C-alpha cells in the first residue's frame, strides 16, 4: 500500500494531529509501519499516552486502509499528503503541515515547489473604503508582477484581494475552513467559480465539512504556510487576521501591516503589529516590490533556470572560506543571486532544519544575508 493511504487513515483518528504524525514517522520510518505497531511500541512515542493509544487501537480495528481510501476517493478525488511529491513544499516545511490537503482548481507545479512567489493578503471582514482601496491596489499590482495571492475568501479584505487579483489577470489561492466543495460565505459563489477556473481552492477538511468558527484559526496557519510574506491590510485588535500574522511570524515569514490614524479602531490590530516589529506597507508600490525581494517577472519570459526572478550578470566569486563540511555544503548552495529557502534546501541536499541552522550560522559569520520572504544571497 502507498504511504499516502496511511497518512489518510491516521488523519481519521481523533487526537492524533500533524505534530504527533511527524513523531510517528520519525520513530517508525513510515506511517505504514506505525499503523502495524503494537500498543507497547506506540507508547514509546512522545505524546502517545494510554488514552491516545487506546483510541488508535480502537480505530484501527474499524478501518481497512485500502477500502477506506477507495471510499474516500468517491467524494474526495483530489488531495495531497506529505507522502506526495506534489504536496506544497512551503507548507511541508512548517511545524504542523496538514496530514491531508484537499484541493480543487488548477494546480501549478512551480507553485507547489515553492518557486512561484506567493503573498498572503488578509484582514477584517468589515473593512473601510481606505482598506478596500489599498487592498485592491496592492493585490492587482502584485498579480501583474507575477505573484500568486493567497487568502481565505472571507467577506471583506479576503474577497477584495481575490477579486482584484483575478481582475488583473493573476492567479489566486483560497484556503477554506470548510470542505473545498462548501462555498462560505454562500454569496461568494461566483468568486469561487472564478478561483476554480484561474487558481486553486484548498482545505484540510474533507468534502461536505460545514463552516464552524473553531476551524478558521487552523485554516489561517495554511494561509501563512503557503505565503512567503503576509500583508495585513486592516484589522481591529481581535481580528482573525492577527492569528495569520502571528503564525506567519512563527514560520519566519515576513509580516507587513497597513498603517492608518491612531484613533481608527479598525486599524488597532495593524498598529499593534507595527509596534511588535511588522514592516509598514509603503505608499509607493515599487518600494513594496523591492521589500518583497527580487522583482518577479512573468513566467512567459524565458530567463533560464530561475524564470520567475530577474537575473543579474554573472560575477567573479571570491574563494570559498574554510568551513565545516555541512556549512560549506549550504554555503555552496547559496549564490550572489537571490534564492528562496526551499531551493537552497534542494540544492544542498540536506534536511530543511539543518539548512535553516546552517544559514543562521552563515549569517552570523557575515557570509550570507537573509532577505524578505525567506530568500537568501551571499554577502
Give residue spans per PLM region:
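Short, small/acidic-rich helices and loops at N termini and domain boundaries
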Residues: 1-85, 365-367, 372-379
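Glycine-biased, small-residue-rich flexible motifs in mid-sequence functional cores and linkers
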Residues: 1-4, 82-379
